[in-house]
Every structure is written in C-alpha cells, then in structure tokens.
C-alpha cells in the first residue's frame, strides 16, 4: 500500500466552517454541559477529515476508504486536534489516566491491568460534581476492582457518577449483543447496581446511544438549569466486529434516529430484525483493485472489512444523532462535546476462522504513522480528536500543539469553574481551543509494557517491522518525541524524532542531540513513581538533581485564600509571601488558609528516601520535581508515605498545606536507605 502525504485543508473546509461559525441565538455564556465521547480502538486514520478523505481524493482503487460525514461536520464546526495523544496504547490504563487526570507514571492502573480498581483519588466526575454538575457514565467501564459485583470497590457510582448504564466488566465489552452473545456469550449490562433485563437484539453501540439520548432528554425536561457531564464510552469499533440489526433510523435527534423505548424485548427502536446482519449499502457491494492491475476485474471487499467499515460508519451516525439532539433541545451552543479514542487501531476481529483475518493495513487506520494499539510510536498513541463548543470554539479551528488525554480533567474543570486537584498532571486546553489566554504546555508522557512485536506491515518502515516491544516509554516536548522500546535500563537511549517533519519516525536524530538525550532521560524520571505491580527497569534509577547557582538557605512560603474542597492547582497570585528558614506553619504568613512552600531539598547522598508527614487531618501534598511524592489531598484520615530514588544534590520541591484546624501544624520526615528516620532538618532547605 502507498503512504499518503498530508494535504492542505481545502478552501471548502474553511468556507463551510465560516458558515457554521455564525452566532446562534438562545444560550447564555454559563457553565457548559460536557459530553466526553470515548470510542474503543479507533485509529487516527479512521476519520475522514484526519485521513480517509485524502484516500478518497486520490481515487486509487487499490486503497479502499471509509467516509465519516457526521464526524467531519463536527470537526468543521469545531476544532480538529491533530497532535492529541492517548495516555496509554491500550484501553484500561488509558481510561484510568483520563478519569484521574494523571499520567501513567502516577496512575493506579497501568499496563494490562484490566478490571483493576481505578484508585482512591479525585476523578473527573467528582471534580465536576463539586461544581454542581449532574454526572452520568454510559458504556464500557472496566475499572471496577475485584469481585463479582455489583458492589465493586470502584463502581462508577462510588467515584463521582450519579448514574451509570453499561458494561462494568472489561471482557463484556468484546461482545456487542449482551443477550444473544453471538460470538463470545451473553453479557451483563448494569443500570447503577442492577442488571438490565429485556435487551434482546440490542446492539450495544445503538443501546448506549439510546440511553445517552434518553438521559439528556429527561435531564433537560426536569433539571435544565443544572449542567450535566456525560462520560459516553462506546465499546466499538473494538472486536468482535459485529453488525447492527438494521439501517440507522432516519432523522436523528429528538424525534428521529435511535430512540429509547424502555420496553423489555424492545428496549430500543433497532431491537428487531436479525442480529449481526446489516451492512451499509455502500460497503455491501464494494469492490477494490486487489492486485493493483487495472486490466483484471476488481474483487469484493472481504466480509471482515465490510464489517469494520459498517461499525465505523455506525459510530459516525450515532455521534451525528447525538449532536442533532443537542440542536433540537437548543443546548448545542453551550455544550462542550469531545470525541476521541482510547488508543490506536487494533488488528483484532474475534471472528470465526472462515473470515479473513483483520489487519489495519486494508484502510490504513494508522494514517501517516507507524505503530498500532500497544505501540508507543505515533500510530499507537496519536488519536483523531475533535472538540465542539460553538459559543467558544470557532468553526474551522485546527489545534496542532501537542496535548494528551489526561488534559481533559483540567480542561473540563476550567470550563466548569471547578478547582483542579493539585495532583493533576494535565493542563487546561481551553486557551488552544478558544484562542483566549496563554496555553500552558502539556506534559506528554507514556509508559507501558507489552510482550510481542510491532507487526511487519509493508506500510511500516523496515526498521520498525518486527521490533520487540517489552518495556516502552514515550515523551514529547515541542516538536520532538523520544521513544524507547524493549528498555533494559535507564541508560538506554531514546530514539529522537521531529514528528512535525517526520511523522513516520524514520530519521532518528539521537546521534547528534546529546543534550536533548540527557534532557529526555532526566525528564522521564522526574514525573513518575514506581509501582510494584507494574515494575520497570528504570524504577531504581536516581532522579537527577539540579545545578543551582548560589542557592540560599530556607524556603519561600506563599499563602492563598482558596474556596475549594481540596488543594487545587494554583494559578492565582499569592496574597502574601515570605522567606522562611524552615518548614513550619508558624513561620509562614498568617494571611490565607493555604500555605505553599517552594524551594529546593538538599539530598545528602544518593539513594532511596521515604517521606512521611504529620499533618493532623488537614489536606497536604508534596511534589519533588513533577513527582507526586506525598498525597494527602483526597483522604485526610491517614498519613501518606512515599518513596523516591534521589541523586545527591538539590531537587525542586513544592509542599502544600491547608489550614483546617485551630492549631495547624506540619512535620515532614524522611527515612534514608539505612532506615534512619528523622524530621527533614532546616539545613536541608534552599531557595
């Protein structure tokens, strides 16, 4: 297959975008409704405006294509985010990072830890609920924790959602007919804590769309003055590649499209006909030039690819249906809708042996990149992401600055006026999306481990084909991406690529970028903590110290007045600041209820240091570099403990303490590798 170069966005795109950007009537500039649409295993190259339209424009009959008119329309009306990344190249860790707002070096769910509890900390839903949002999750979950249920440790209703409807278990999302279980057996759909009966012939993509629409309609009828947040997690196009029962109902929106009926045996209006049967007409009889010879007859697309194309087109219809509902209810203007995928394209179909094996080569779902699901090259992580919010995002916006999926918690909190927990690794993307304010750079970092190799696809560079995966890392700073595969230790070099000029990552610049190499190696240690359940070959590496010219003894103590249920990321100016000799609440300025000490910690010797604190029942948080070392910001009924490997020398530190008692006090301890525990002495602090 051929590699298609990037093409300029057409004048037609900008003309249509201009027309759609004309202001509409009827909505105030208030807290927006927020809908986060997360699809499963959709490649960057699966969406028309990101790649498939380019294939069509070349009209190469050996290169089949898929159209996504509804998603194209959404992109033209809003923002295309061309350089947006998934937090991990597989679903469970990717979703966990999204919902918790942290990178994989801080997440409780890493690697292939399917069905592991998401962790006890602030979630996207809890943050938005604090800003009076009604919160609902629809679709695939897979982050509930051990047990048979329904009382799982991190069931959606226990982590900030008011309502839930969908598949709780990860594996259930691999079958799209929960009753008939056509290929992988029947599955359980839950509404809150109860299993749902009567879902005969319900194709899950349609079912989740119907339930999402039903919630929005009922919410607007009853609580239209209260904003809502919806986490809509489709289980498609992930295998098994099952077909819907029938064509998509006409119309869309309030009175058309998929409709929730609520009757057992006829729960939705497409729960009739034959399960796993309908192929879109444009694919049913599609042919292609299989041998790249115009003199020979074309052949039909294999049924496997008719299925994949139908599933993708169905997603397009489902999103269009939902967007039409927002228009019909006159809430589109002030509803922020984000569409993205959890990782890159898959090569799985889970179909019986008589079907042709599925490969993303047929449609080039990986677009201009190398790598697929489970890779940290661009094809495994770059996601086709669209943001739509007419009142604030201009039509035709193209955002090409790098960002990552754990930025959405901070973004949604910013839009809602909610405080962002200080633990959050993400940043608000509103400046990029709206063109207002200065965009803070995203911290784009991924770590992941997976056995196996990169597929030997002809489209991929020979140097990438068959490459061992193993322990992997990716970090992006500006236009540069650093990648490590099959890591044996911290001294392994990153491959370095300028992905703005070399999206396929064919020219490794590491041989003449020694300073950048050192910077990437240091950066990758300064934003993560080790996890015993996901060990890494660099867990014992020492976090490099900094060279600081003429440091002075002591710290800077800043105080703030905050109105927040937790310690937030701070963007406002301090109301007071003072140079202090030690870490003591009594020495900080008296004004304000939040103290933040900033400076450097002088580590006397290389080694592992374990930190702990006596902070009473007050909220408390400590970062060294960008490492979350001590987190007492979620639960205040226990003392946090955190360990980190530190090189001798100075390390930047920020320590936060919320004064919540009549006699506020804070003591910080460290224990060295010999087991000696002491309060961090005043002489260890510099500014």
Where are these regions (language model features)?
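C-terminal, low-complexity/hydrophilic appendages and adjacent surface loops
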Residues: 183, 373-379, 448-510
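Active-site-proximal cap/lid insertion segments
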Residues: 41-65, 168-403, 409, 413-427, ...
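Extracellular/secretory pathway-exposed regions associated with glycan biology
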Residues: 533-610, 614-687
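Polar, surface-exposed loop/tail segments
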Residues: 69, 98, 140, 144, ...
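Loop/turn elements at helix/coil->beta-strand transitions in domains of secreted/extracellular proteins
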Residues: 30-35, 77-82, 130-136, 159-162, ...
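Bacterial Sec-dependent N-terminal signal peptides
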Residues: 1-29
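Short, solvent-exposed turn/loop segments enriched in Gly/Ser/Thr/Pro and often Arg
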Residues: 41, 50-51, 78-102, 113-116, ...
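Active-site segment of extracytoplasmic enzymes that catalyze sulfate/phosphate-ester chemistry
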Residues: 36-37, 44-136, 146-148, 159, ...
């Amino acid at each position: 297959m051929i590699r298609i170069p990037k093409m300029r966005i057409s004048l037609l795109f900008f003309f249509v975008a201009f027309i759609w950007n004309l202001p509409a009537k009827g909505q105030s500039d208030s807290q927006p409704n927020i809908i986060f649409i997360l699809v499963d295993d959709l490649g960057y190259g699966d969406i028309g405006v990101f790649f498939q339209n380019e294939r069509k424009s070349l009209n190469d009959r050996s290169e089949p294509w898929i159209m996504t008119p509804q998603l194209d329309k959404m992109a033209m009306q809003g923002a295309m985010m061309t350089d947006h990344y998934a937090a991990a190249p597989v679903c469970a860790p990717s979703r966990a990072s999204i919902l918790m707002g942290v990178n994989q070096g801080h997440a409780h769910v890493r690697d292939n830890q399917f069905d592991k509890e998401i962790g006890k900390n602030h979630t996207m839903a809890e943050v938005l609920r604090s800003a009076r949002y009604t919160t609902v999750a629809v679709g695939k979950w897979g982050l509930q924790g051990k047990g048979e249920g329904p009382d799982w440790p991190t069931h959606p209703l226990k982590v900030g959602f008011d309502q839930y409807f969908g598949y709780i278990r990860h594996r259930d999302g691999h079958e799209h007919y929960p009753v008939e279980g056509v290929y992988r057996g029947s599955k359980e759909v839950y509404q809150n804590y109860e299993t749902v009966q009567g879902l005969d012939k319900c194709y899950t993509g349609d079912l989740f769309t119907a339930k999402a629409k039903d919630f929005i309609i009922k919410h607007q009828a009853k609580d239209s003055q209260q904003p809502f947040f919806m986490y809509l997690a489709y289980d498609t196009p992930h295998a098994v590649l099952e077909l819907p029962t029938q064509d998509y109902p006409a119309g869309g929106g309030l009175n058309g499209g998929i409709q929730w009926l609520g009757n057992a045996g006829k729960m939705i209006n497409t729960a009739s006909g034959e399960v796993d049967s309908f192929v879109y007409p444009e694919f049913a009889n599609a042919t292609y030039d299989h041998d790249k010879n115009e003199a020979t007859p074309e052949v039909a697309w294999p049924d496997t690819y008719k299925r994949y194309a139908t599933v993708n087109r169905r997603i397009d219809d489902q999103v269009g249906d939902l967007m039409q509902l927002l228009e019909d209810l006159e809430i589109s203007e002030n509803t922020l809708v984000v569409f993205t995928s959890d990782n890159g394209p898959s090569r799985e179909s889970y179909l019986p042996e008589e079907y042709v094996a599925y490969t993303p080569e047929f449609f080039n779902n990986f677009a201009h990149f190398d790598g697929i699901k489970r890779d940290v090259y661009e094809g495994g992580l770059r996601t086709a992401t669209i943001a739509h919010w007419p009142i604030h995002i201009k039509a035709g916006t193209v955002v090409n600055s790098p960002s990552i999926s754990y930025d959405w918690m901070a973004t949604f909190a910013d839009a809602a006026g909610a405080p962002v927990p200080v633990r959050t690794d993400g940043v608000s993307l509103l400046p990029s999306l709206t063109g207002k304010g200065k965009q803070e750079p995203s911290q784009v970092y991924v770590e992941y481990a997976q056995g196996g190799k990169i597929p030997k696809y002809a489209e991929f560079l020979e140097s990438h084909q068959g490459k061992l995966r193993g322990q992997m890392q990716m970090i992006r700073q500006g236009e540069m991406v650093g990648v490590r595969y099959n890591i044996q230790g911290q001294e392994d070099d990153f491959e370095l690529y300028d992905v703005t000029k070399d999206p396929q990552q064919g020219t490794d610049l590491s041989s003449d970028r020694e300073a950048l190499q050192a910077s990437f190696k240091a950066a990758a240690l300064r934003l993560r903590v080790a996890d015993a359940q996901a060990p890494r070959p660099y867990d014992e590496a020492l976090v490099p110290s900094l060279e600081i010219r003429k440091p002075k003894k002591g710290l800077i103590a800043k105080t703030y007045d905050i109105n927040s249920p937790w310690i937030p990321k701070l963007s406002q100016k301090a109301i007071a600041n003072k140079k202090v000799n030690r870490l003591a609440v009594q020495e900080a300025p008296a004004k304000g209820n939040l103290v933040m000490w900033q400076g450097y910690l002088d580590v006397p010797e290389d080694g592992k240091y374990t930190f702990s604190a006596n902070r009473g029942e007050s909220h408390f948080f400590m970062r060294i570099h960008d490492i979350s070392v001590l987190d007492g910001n979620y639960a205040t009924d226990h003392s946090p403990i955190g360990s980190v490997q530190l090189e001798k020398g100075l390390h930047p530190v920020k320590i936060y303490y919320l004064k919540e008692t009549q006699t506020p006090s804070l003591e910080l301890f460290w224990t060295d590798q010999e087991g000696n525990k002491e309060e961090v002495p005043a002489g260890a602090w510099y500014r």
